[in-house]
């Protein structure tokens, strides 16, 4: 309900590093997605004078487990037990611009995607695809929502993954490493969208942006700057890629590696759940992504030594 110094300080730092103009603090990534969806719908409602607008999301995407965020998640086994979900969602194929074009109607208000698909198998957006989607959004007055909840906060060597592409969203979501363990998320808006969407009372939060999390977010960004963590990720990530490539070359049951920065996946012919469990017994925490990908998402403080140990454990 009120502004306070820790919130203001955190918001200024977030807007400065992101190039966005407004930020709304939430408690989680899923809540940030909910806020982004509401913003897009309100924008289209004010523009067109009616409700019932649609959103285009990507197949094999993951945006959260609340009803709204699950509605734009393109992974069926997450959705199926909770159907029917929010209507007005169409799904297109990631990195397939023609597929996106085919889903656009006069009711489309937003296109939402992860800049790097995590749960879907560690697929980075192709540069031509992301720029093409941006161009489609500009041509049809559709808002581009980029989900940076997993791939943001320095993981790719840029504070936000989209910054490497130079394709700016209208709305962005962030969470996870934003508070380094403190529960906080956020959605960001350009000034143009902020001026033509949510009004006071349209959206709210009881605990989002409280003084504690505001101080935590500020401390995280101070640490990024003091330790040059973006530069560190750009230095250590190629070494991790090299170590994973060596494993792929050595073992026939490993097929290929893909990803960006410290967000890597290795396609595996063996049951990945069993491989992840065996790695845990060796003291290495890895997770799965889809049915056949081992996902490596180490902290941005990851070192060359840790990358070497990762290879040794595997």
Language model feature labels by segment:
Residues 1-306, 311-314:
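Conserved N-terminal phosphate-binding loop of PLP-dependent enzymes in the Aspartate aminotransferase
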């Amino acid at each position: 309900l009120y502004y306070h110094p820790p919130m203001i300080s955190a918001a200024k730092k977030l807007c400065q590093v992101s190039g966005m103009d407004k930020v709304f603090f939430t408690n989680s990534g899923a809540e940030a997605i909910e806020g982004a969806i509401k913003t897009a719908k309100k924008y289209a409602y004010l523009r067109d004078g009616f409700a019932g607008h649609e959103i285009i999301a990507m197949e094999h995407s993951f945006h959260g487990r609340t009803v709204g965020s699950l509605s734009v998640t393109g992974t069926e086994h997450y959705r199926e037990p909770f159907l029917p979900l929010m209507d007005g969602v169409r799904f297109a194929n990631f990195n397939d611009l023609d597929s996106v074009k085919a889903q656009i109607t006069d009711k489309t208000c937003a296109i939402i995607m992860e800049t790097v698909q995590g749960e879907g198998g560690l697929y980075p957006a192709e540069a031509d695809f992301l720029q093409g989607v941006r161009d489609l959004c500009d041509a049809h007055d559709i808002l581009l929502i980029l989900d940076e909840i997993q791939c943001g906060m320095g993981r790719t060597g840029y504070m936000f993954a989209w910054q490497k592409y130079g394709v700016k969203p209208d709305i962005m979501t962030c969470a996870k490493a934003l508070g380094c363990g403190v529960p906080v998320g956020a959605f960001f808006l350009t000034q143009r969208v902020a001026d033509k969407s949510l009004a006071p009372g349209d959206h709210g939060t009881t605990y989002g942006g409280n003084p504690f999390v505001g101080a935590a977010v500020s401390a995280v960004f101070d640490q990024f700057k003091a330790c040059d963590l973006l530069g560190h990720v750009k230095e250590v990530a190629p070494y991790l890629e090299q170590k994973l490539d060596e494993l792929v070359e050595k073992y026939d049951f490993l097929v290929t590696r893909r990803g960006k920065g410290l967000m890597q996946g290795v396609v595996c012919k063996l049951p990945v759940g069993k491989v992840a469990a065996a790695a845990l017994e060796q003291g290495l925490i890895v997770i799965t992504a889809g049915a056949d990908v081992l996902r490596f998402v180490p902290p941005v403080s990851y070192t060359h030594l840790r990358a070497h140990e990762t290879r040794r454990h595997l």
